[in-house]
UniProtKB/Swiss-Prot annotation:
A biological process term (GO) from this entry: response to caloric restriction
Region called Disordered, residue ranges: 1-88, 184-210, 332-366
PROSITE patterns, per database record: FORK_HEAD_1, FORK_HEAD_2, FORK_HEAD_3
GO CC terms, sorted: nucleus
Segments of skewed composition (Basic residues): 332-345
Assembly notes: Interacts with elt-2.
DNA-binding region listed in the record: 236-330
Gene designation per UniProt: pha-4
Biased composition (Acidic residues): 1-10
Protein name stated in the entry: Defective pharyngeal development protein 4
Gene3D superfamilies the record matches: Winged helix-like DNA-binding domain superfamily/Winged helix DNA-binding domain
Amino acid sequence: MTSPSSDEDIIDIRVIKEEPESEPDSEAEPATTTNSTDSEDSVEQENKKLLETEKNRKREQKHKMLPNGTTSGTSDTGNQVPATSSAASSVDYTAMNAQDYLPTYSNTTLNYQPYQYQTAANGLLNYNNYSQYATANQLGSNYISPANFMQGGGISPLGFTTGTTGATTAAASVATSSASAVIGRSNGRSSSTVAASPADRSYSGVSGGQGQELTIQEFETVTEKIRRHGTYGQSKPPYSYISLITMAIQKSNSRQLTLSEIYNWIMDLFPYYQNNQQRWQNSIRHSLSFNDCFVKVARSPDKPGKGSFWTLHEHCGNMFENGCYLRRQKRFKVKEREPSRKKRNANSQQLHQQQHIPKMEIKEEDPTSITTTSSLGAYSLIPQISTKKEIKEELKAVQDATAAAANLGLIDPSGTPSAVNHSQPTSVISSVGTLGTTQAQMTLNGQYASPYLYSSDFATILPQSQNFLNNTLYNTTSSYPGIDYTNGVYQNTLYSSTNPNSAANL
């Protein structure tokens, strides 16, 4: 066996060693020797050629796993193996980019039509004149007609179909939803889960309790159910608490019921109220107390028992139209009611305070009469006393003042006033007078007989300001020596162009 002559032989040897053992023994390298003699057998030559061919085949398979390039070498038998290249091989070992992996399609194969984008030249941006649209969109045109503007069956929920057929369909849908609402309430389901019709609106009672305003057809269905089964069922009835109380009172023989009888009537006809009794019974009591249409009647001697009767006010009339208790026509309100006990007590106390307030005498000046005594109430002069404590304090102060006056002798202890008159006469101005012509003279220790300090004119005594300024402060006749800046003592002290030496003094 010859030694390898190149790197390719080394690679081939390694590949052969890594092959599994299950390969036939013919793949292994035969231990043959090359002899140049002519005595070799023809069979051995054929076997050698077969092995050579098999080795070349396996070498080509291994080249697929190696990098691109050209390899050359000698075989184990010493024969020169021709160099293999990517160009000569049947497999292309050249590197491929991303474009090579993309599949190629042709328009003729898949029948793809090229898309032509809209441009300003092919009509997308070519707008017609406004006059053409104005002519087309006149009255009666398809563009401006409401029937064509809002079409049913579209994505928008606002779309609907107009015309006779559309109106019939809408009416049928309303009737269907209304019937489904009745069925939902009859089966005990919540009304919120059923599609409510336009006629099925919520109604809230005045004193609490949720009710619903049903249509006439729905009300007839509810009434028929009560008449057929005797009760409404386990579902909540669509009546307010005021409606329930009114029905109970009107269905009774005496037109008056006690509170417990109202409870029992409601629970017998509507089994829904057999549960959670405390809550709705409180609402019933509030409705009876805070609505003027219900009147409380005391028990008569021939009807002993506990609790008063409740009946309807005689002037409330028929609050529910045509016997429909789903909604009242109007709320009944008594115009004038008797004042409550608190108001009556407050009024009596206020009247009692006004009676105990003492009267006061006020003197007024009048040209015809000297004095006039008038008695005024507490609302005109004295502020209203609001509490009993203030009344007691004022009474105590009056008693103390009376006792003090009695001690001083101003008031007789027997209770009659003393004869001492402390009143002063009232002065009345009857006319307007004038002052006297003579005036009193001021005497200051006899030195001055006149109230004036100077009897003569002050203008002649005061100094003249013009003469004072001219003669005293400013003398016009004297001359003041002037300062000669040219020939004086301070000549050439400032910088001058004629004396350059003075520049150093700056």
